[in-house]
């Protein structure tokens, strides 16, 4: 099958990142100074405050009043930043009926248990993972009451806004995180951390003195935890509209999902280190089996290079096993990557994050070293995007 041709700005940026340092030094100094200025507009306390704001709505489970209130709050925040074209995507969600095998109508499914979701191979110590469904495991009575109303099938909404480009408004990058959660906690990390990151990027890029050649759409997905339903609905409803005024051509999709916790592999007894490991990093993933694997891999390395130049604390690594997040519905239509605290399949899926889908996924669980890992992911994405869309300050 013929591979798609990469967009011109993408090719130019990849080439630019390969130019030796002496040649880069001859570049226009104003543009060379631009990205550090934008990165400096990200702030740890602002990022933390946005995560904290999201946790006011508990786990934000899809199909609940608390989820709808969170969508309203996110929209109000985006409008306060001055982000353009604030809109909502509407879709209907009807969960599959339970099957006798307990797989929501999917029946019995077998797979190689030595291989992780996404294609990686488990290594080292593995700890048990799962979704907490027991309300009594949440000791905070206030939060337990907030998270009690169940999900109801029906119409869903997710909010997005767009930074409209000045010269190529008909082309855009999609930047996402999912705002819904599960587990009887506050969904602070999964995925308050990614949602807050995307909102902070929207704030920085929406400043009146920031201009971009190409557009950026910031999307806060709903229904990720039920099967990527919100992002699937977006692809189904809007893929064919590309090139129109309301849906610029997709140049790439960048997802952010669980950004805070990289304390290392579980110990033999299943416990983990209490503090962020010194060698913590931002995982940048693409899917090697996708139709746009080559382009997605190159996009991932663009983000890796941006991290090397502009992130303040933690490095990045690139992997080929992107899975189980809202970039997946896009991966066969456009270069798609995701940024995470750890590789989703082989590490998070092996118990590297004990708060994943648990009552302990609370704002209070994390400290500044954890929040700073999320901020470094924000710095990475902001720096890479600024180059990809031709950002300027004037």
Residue spans of the language-model regions?
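N-terminal capping segment at the start of a domain
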Residues: 27-65, 81, 89, 94-102, ...
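His/Asp/Glu-rich mid-to-C-terminal helical/loop segments that flank catalytic regions of hydrolases
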Residues: 345-394
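Structural recognition of the beta-strand scaffold that forms the well-ordered cores
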Residues: 47-55, 85-89, 158-162, 172-176, ...
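Second-shell loop/turn segments in exported
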Residues: 33-42, 55-66, 145-150, 180-192, ...
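Metal-dependent peptidase/peptidase-like ectodomains
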Residues: 221-326, 332-336, 343
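A non-catalytic alpha/beta surface segment that caps or lines the substrate-entry region
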Residues: 49-162
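Alpha-helical metal-binding/catalytic segments enriched in His/Glu/Asp
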Residues: 159-161, 175-228, 381
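N-terminal signal peptide c-region/cleavage motif recognized by signal peptidases
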Residues: 20-22
